[in-house]
A protein has these predicted regions:
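Glycine-biased low-complexity/repetitive sequence motifs
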Residues: 1-228
């Protein structure tokens, strides 16, 4: 684009730098490294966290740089009690820049006090299942500066153990944390993703996933930028 060349990698590959910049040029590249999102939990599960989002500038020299593109995490298995959590998304890397996969969404587990969301680039959503509050998974794990993501949403217990309605919480996104979900009502939205214009136009990446629901509760939708 203009004096710039855009390289986009949707799968793992090698970025080959053949020559350094001229005396009047630059040896710096702008990068955006996005990890895979976390899988949602099974059996009225919490939303998966958005994949880690890291952007900045990096000096390069004439050599090959390995690119790893992390895939999305697997969903938790439903139709059973306890429901299984999803799995963490895959890590994406460029040179020494690493973005962590999104945290797993919690699975619903009747008879267990609470199921917390998993940690990751952004954290997964939790599910409260009795008189205890579930926590969202920690975002920006491992810690980076600037932060690669935000926490997942927690879930507050507002019903008797094991009774409907039940609603799970949402995953965090690169642009905003997942907000806590009222277990009896649901109807929340996953954490918003973060925008980047590195591809020439503005796109949003790494939104948090929505949470499931049962009975009269309303399932939560995913956040902008990829949350499902």
């Amino acid at each position: 684009s203009g004096n710039f060349k855009i390289h986009r990698f949707n799968s793992s590959a090698t970025f080959a730098v053949n020559d350094g910049g001229s005396a009047g040029g630059s040896n710096t590249v702008e990068y955006l490294v996005v990890a895979g999102g976390g899988g949602g939990g099974g059996q009225i599960g919490g939303g998966g966290g958005g994949g880690g989002f890291r952007t900045g500038n990096l000096s390069v020299s004439a050599q090959n740089y390995s690119i790893t593109v992390g895939g999305g995490g697997s969903r938790g298995v439903g139709g059973s009690t306890p429901g299984n959590p999803g799995s963490q998304g895959g890590t994406s890397t460029f040179s020494n820049i690493s973005s962590a996969g999104g945290g797993s969404g919690a699975g619903f587990s009747q008879g267990i006090p609470a199921s917390n969301g998993g940690a990751g680039g952004s954290g997964g959503g939790g599910v409260a299942t009795s008189n205890n509050t579930a926590s969202g998974g920690a975002g920006n794990t491992p810690s980076t500066s600037p932060s690669q993501g935000n926490n997942g949403g927690g879930s507050s217990p507002t019903r008797a153990s094991g009774s409907a309605p039940i609603a799970a919480s949402v995953g965090g996104g690169a642009g905003a944390a997942g907000t806590n979900t009222n277990t009896a009502n649901g109807n929340n939205t996953g954490g918003a993703g973060a925008a980047s214009s590195i591809l020439g136009s503005s796109f949003t990446f790494s939104g948090g996933g929505g949470g499931g629901a049962l009975g009269t509760a309303t399932a939560s939708s995913g956040g902008s930028g990829g949350g499902g």
